[in-house]
């Protein structure tokens, strides 16, 4: 269960409806994907359509990374106050 707090579902291929069986991505994997997207967005030869698609993907990676970071913070806070029930 501890590992589940720090992983999100990897983005499934389009047209995939079952996300419960999707593999999980760690915070670091989200950040790495975001870094790669930023590098690719800096390519002057990137088309507008590809740039917009990449931007959407990057924003999703950022959102998921932030969610994992928030979960880690909440878990840390919970560990700092062990006398309170979760």
From Swiss-Prot:
Enzyme Commission number(s): 3.1.11.6
Pfam families hit by this protein: Exonuc_VII_S
Subcellular location: Cytoplasm
Any one of the GO BP annotations: DNA catabolic process
InterPro entries: Exonuc_VII_S (IPR003761), Exonuc_VII_ssu_sf (IPR037004)
Keywords: Cytoplasm, Exonuclease, Hydrolase, Nuclease
GO molecular function: exodeoxyribonuclease VII activity
Chief place where the protein resides: cytoplasm
GO terms under cellular component: cytoplasm; exodeoxyribonuclease VII complex
Signal sequence annotation: none
Region (Disordered): 1-26
Reaction catalysis annotation: Exonucleolytic cleavage in either 5'- to 3'- or 3'- to 5'-direction to yield nucleoside 5'-phosphates
Family the UniProt entry places it in: Belongs to the XseB family.
Stored HAMAP family: Exonuc_7_S (MF_00337)
Assembly behavior: Heterooligomer composed of large and small subunits.
Function, as annotated: Bidirectionally degrades single-stranded DNA into large acid-insoluble oligonucleotides, which are then degraded further into small acid-soluble oligonucleotides.
Protein known as: Exodeoxyribonuclease 7 small subunit
Organism of origin: Helicobacter pylori (strain ATCC 700392 / 26695)
